[in-house]
Design a protein with these regions (language model features):
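Flexible phosphate-sensing "switch/lid" loops adjacent to ATP/NTP-binding sites
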Residues: 5-25, 29-33, 37-218
């Protein structure tokens, strides 16, 4: 178990909002919808395109894969924001900081999304969604809302009435692994039409659409 805190963070103070880089957080409609792989694929794309990029793992699998990060669920709630803030501040010299997302604001069993939003003072968000999910995976009585409403929720919460950076959802990472190639293409096309955002499955089609969206939007 790698979920052992390596430092005792200070209480977060919003310092990350003063940084001049892009802080990209993957947020989700549920747990386990592809937030980690999306962040890693965008990070890889950024490096291949000569962008100075860093990746911050926030869960045990991400830490195991990359060899560093913060085990967010090992921190007491009041210190979780500070842990995220401290890691982001350490990456102040990187142009892009990809933060591995955790949980979902829609999930009643998740408390992880807000500390990452607040601690990183995120500037860009990628919404991650399973194409075959109409409800939460483990709470099937909870329907996933229209994704435009989910986008509005994350953007409103991130800015907190304008006192934090006005973070935008700049693209959607659609997990289509349960769909055949024809259904996957239709799902991507439908979401692009209904949200006016770039949509891709980063495993099936690559992350370029999302990387370009981050690059173009300040």
């Amino acid at each position: 178990d790698v979920r052992v805190p390596q430092f005792i963070p200070e209480i977060a103070s919003g310092k990350a909002a003063k940084l001049n880089n892009k802080r990209i957080l993957c947020v989700g409609t549920d747990m386990a919808v592809g937030k980690m792989i999306t962040s890693l694929e965008i990070h890889k794309w950024a490096i291949e395109n000569k962008i100075k990029s860093a990746f911050i793992a926030t869960g045990q699998i991400g830490i195991t894969v990359t060899g560093s990060g913060i085990p967010l669920d090992a921190y007491k709630v009041d210190y979780a924001c500070g842990a995220g803030e401290q890691m982001v501040l350490q990456k102040s010299n990187d142009d892009w900081v990809l933060i591995e997302g955790q949980g979902s604001l829609l999930n009643p069993g998740s408390t992880a999304s807000l500390p990452l939003i607040r601690g990183s003072c995120t500037t860009h968000m990628i919404l991650c969604h399973r194409a075959d999910f109409l409800t939460l995976r483990d709470s099937k009585h909870i329907k996933i809302p229209n994704l435009n409403e989910v986008i509005k929720l994350y953007e409103t919460l991130a800015s907190a009435c304008g006192i934090y950076p006005k973070a935008k959802v700049v693209g959607i990472s659609l997990n289509t692994f349960k769909l055949d190639s024809i259904a996957a293409k239709k799902a991507v096309d439908f979401l692009e039409s209904s949200t006016n955002l770039p949509v891709t499955d980063v495993v099936r089609y690559g992350p370029e659409k999302l990387g370009l969206a981050i690059k173009q939007i300040n």
